[in-house]
Amino acid sequence: MTESASSTSGQEFDVFSVMDWKDGVGTLPGSDLKFRVNEFGALEVITDESEMESVKKATATTTWMVPTAQDAPTSPPSSRPVFPPAYWTSPPGCPTVFSEKTGVPFRLKEQSKADGLQFCENCCQYGNGDECLSGGKYCSQNCARHAKDKDQKDERDGGEDNDEEDPKCSRKKKPKLSLKADSKDDGEERDDEMENKQDGRILRGSQRARRKRRGDSAVLKQGLPPKGKKTWCWASYLEEEKAVAVPTKLFKEHQSFPYNKNGFKVGMKLEGVDPDHQAMYCVLTVAEVCGYRIKLHFDGYSDCYDFWVNADALDIHPVGWCEKTGHKLRPPKGYKEEEFNWQSYLKTCKAQAAPKSLFENQNITVIPSGFRVGMKLEAADKKSPSVICVATVTDMVDNRFLVHFDNWDESYDYWCESNSPHIHPVGWCKEHRRTLITPPGYSHVKHFSWDKYLEETNSLPAPARAFKVKPPHGFQKKMKLEAVDKRNPLFIRVATVADTDDHRIKVHFDGWSSCYDYWIDADSPDIHPVGWCSKTGHPLQAPLSPAELMEPSETGGCPTLGCRGVGHFKKSRYLGTQSGANCPYSEINLSKERIFPDRLSGDTSPPTTPSFPRSKRMDTRESSSSPETREKHANNFKEDSEKKKENEVKTSAEAKVVREEPTPSVQQSQPPQQVQQVQHAQPPQQAQKAPQAQQAQQAQQAQQAPQAPQTPQPQQAPQVQQAQQAPQAQQAQQPQQAQQPQQAPPVQQPQQVQQAQPTQQQAQTQQQAQRRSAVFLSFKPPIPCLPLRWEQQSKLLPTVAGIPASRVSKWSTDEVSEFIQSLPGCEEHGKVFKDEQIDGEAFLLMTQTDIVKIMSIKLGPALKIFNSILMFKAAEKNSHNEL
């Protein structure tokens, strides 16, 4: 009897309940002894102050789950004794959990409920539910009173801590706290956390602490609403719209949530594929970093060619990858391929190469395929899927290969995998009764035979077994996702699947008009699952509200409804859309594709790669976006060819009297865009049926050359006009025409000059037209050997024309200063050049960067000064050509 009583009292007594626990340290009332719980669940006396600090630190950052000495297996639950409130204890067999906040051990509540017991939030013990107080929270009045006093003390301590905090820290914490109720992407974690807080215990730590440990501090900034507006989150939006998000399992690995952070930094150098010339690898620099995306810039070229990619993109590689894999790297503008060296270039630029560890595509497992370089296949143009042409595999990297259209330039090549729906085995078109576009210039067009073509080209067809069938994408209409805005790639918007086909989806931006919808491949890296922006720290553009659709944005200043003044139709990040003409969302730009001169056409550096005849096929950025355009040109080809022959006869007759009577400008009879299509928009049928029509087309272009708007000038000889307007490839075929000076102005007769004197009012109108033409790109292709917009910019500096660089190199510092002051808008900058003792020779060696950064001159005047230097050099070159 005595033994049973003693055992019962020993079982009822819990040493943890008689101690005061705080930060993992237990204090025994009435003594100075301090205890801690070791890794085996046993109590240990703390003898050193440093040991106590380490215990507190470990408790603040760790969630302990260790068994105690009382957690021995005992009798079944039905035979377990129920203790009175004064002797509440831990149920046997239940593991102990130590709170991060208090360090007090407690047991899991779920298991106790299954046993019919109640948990006391103060002493962290269990007992009969019939004897509990305050709705089952406390076992006695003492515990309830003690818990109330503790809460009041915590509130006072919290207020004092907030007052002592750094104001900067407090400002940072306010938006973070406001996001806890809004970021419902982590709803399950938040529900668990709130439930644990109600129980007086924090099992996983606060959400902010977890994010800080993961390094996702940018996630806390995402989704902050503008002033006066409500916050936006996916969970409430899906509930309001009664919509369903696209399941994450439908996205490919490169579209779904990344495993690592984006480690790229602004200024890092790397190698990558040019998206407009996918057969070409270029030197790139990280211009911007936003979430898991990076904006890449072509070294030496305008920022209008910058483009966005994900940090795990397959088309970017570390420095030295091309040399290692045997690929040709195109150096920056102004560098020769044989002289370019990465080490010296990085040293010159004082830049850092992106670490190899940042490139996810370096660890790809290569799966063997049946494709080999040189094999033939039938491939569709991605911009016009109905056009299927003869193609060749020209390169292979990992699990992808490069498709090149035979006898077409490389600007239409693209990378794909073996399961791409755009490629087919040899004979697929014949089997499915589809039209196969043969290579331009191929002799046997009417009776094309694959067997004969393979024999002539000494090549093999890609085996049919190498082509894999792509499974259905699974996307359904009205599902929600996040998608990149192709008209303004800086933004990722809330989107809906508006329509689907076999391998594509139609993306609709919520709140916007359906005129902005566009088709995109289901495996495109520009679409992501719901919550991708929040997880990666990328800003997500919420749907437009009805108020934003009724009134223009007050902050952006753009008249287009919904536009906030960010972005530009011509990709210029630094020009605000203050007018509808520049807004990418305005009605006048909806039907336009972003038409830029080819990045390589204005390259003045020595050619490092063969120039490709871009006139053999239409520009995909202009008119190849729809199959109807190509079919229309193909149907009307015969009629156009006959007209060209007639124009050729007329042109030869008019060329004889070109000095006597100028012909009217083509702008009166044909718009510039139509001229561009005549020159570039030849479908494959055109190129293959009438190779002789190119000469007639060149003659027609010579007749239809647009004239300068300021003064009527006599028409030049056809040879000179062809040399000025023909593409670079056509100039190579006509060396006699290419030898003509391209910058020399036409010689006017004195009588014509007198007749061309405009009035003062006309002069003002012409000056405005010149300024507009210098700012906005024309449809006329630029002269290949001169920089972009050269003709437009040179019109703004008439006083510079005709001065060769050899004369400028002999100028003194005073003469350079006087010249700078003579330029419009540069009157105050002449003194700066004089103070820096810059003579003519040093002036010619200056770059635009030197003028802006070293001389501290604003961009506008710097452009005029730098353009004058270019004009001096061009005049010197023209003088040598004339000799």
UniProtKB/Swiss-Prot annotation:
- Cross-link Glycyl lysine isopeptide (Lys-Gly) (interchain with G-Cter in SUMO2): which residues? K638
Q: Subcellular location, in the record's words? A: Nucleus
Full protein name: Lethal(3)malignant brain tumor-like protein 3
List residues traversing the bilayer. Answer: none
Describe the inactivation phenotype: Death at a late embryonic stage due defective erythropoiesis, defects in the maturation of other types of myeloid lineage cells and anemia.
Matching SMART domains? MBT (SM00561), SAM (SM00454)
Keywords assigned? Chromatin regulator, Isopeptide bond, Metal-binding, Nucleus, Repeat, Transcription, Transcription regulation, Ubl conjugation, Zinc, Zinc-finger
Q: Where is the SAM domain?
A: 811-875
The record's annotation in PANTHER family points to: LETHAL(3)MALIGNANT BRAIN TUMOR-LIKE PROTEIN 3, POLYCOMB GROUP PROTEIN
> What species was this sequence derived from?
Mus musculus (Mouse)
Zinc fingers (CCHHC-type): which spans?
A: 549-593
Question: Does Metal-binding show up as a keyword for this record?
Answer: yes
Q: Where is the composition biased (Acidic residues)?
A: 157-166, 185-194
Q: Which GO terms describe its biological process?
A: chromatin organization; erythrocyte maturation; granulocyte differentiation; macrophage differentiation; myeloid cell differentiation; negative regulation of DNA-templated transcription; negative regulation of transcription initiation-coupled chromatin remodeling; positive regulation of ubiquitin-dependent protein catabolic process
Which residues does the annotated region (Interaction with RBPJ. Required for transcription repressor activity on Notch target genes) include? 1-64
Low complexity bias spans: 663-742, 749-768
Q: What tissues express this gene product?
A: Detected in hematopoietic progenitor cells in fetal liver. Detected in adult bone marrow, heart, brain, spleen, lung, liver, kidney and testis.
The ranges of the MBT repeats are: 232-332, 340-439, 448-543
Role noted for this protein? Is a negative regulator of Notch target genes expression, required for RBPJ-mediated transcriptional repression. It recruits KDM1A to Notch-responsive elements and promotes KDM1A-mediated H3K4me demethylation. Involved in the regulation of ubiquitin-dependent degradation of a set of methylated non-histone proteins, including SOX2. It acts as an adapter recruiting the CRL4-DCAF5 E3 ubiquitin ligase complex to methylated target proteins. Also involved in the regulation of ubiquitin-dependent degradation of methylated DNMT1 and E2F1. Required for normal maturation of myeloid progenitor cells.
* GO MF assignments: chromatin binding; identical protein binding; methylation-dependent protein binding; zinc ion binding
Q: Where is the composition biased (Basic and acidic residues)?
A: 146-156, 616-662
Q: Where is this region: Disordered?
A: 146-223, 595-768
Query: Please, which domain of life does this record's source organism belong to?
Result: Eukaryota
Classification of source organism = Eukaryota, Metazoa, Chordata, Craniata, Vertebrata
Q: How does it assemble?
A: Interacts with RNF2. Interacts (via SAM domain) with SAMD1 (via SAM domain); the interaction mediates L3MBTL3 binding to chromatin. Interacts with RBPJ; the interaction is required for L3MBTL3 localization to chromatin and is impaired the Notch-derived peptides containing the intracellular domain (NICD). Interacts (via SAM domain) with KDM1A. Interacts with DCAF5. Interacts with DNMT1. Interacts with E2F1. Interacts with SOX2. Interacts with SFMBT1.
GO cellular component labels? nucleolus; nucleoplasm; nucleus
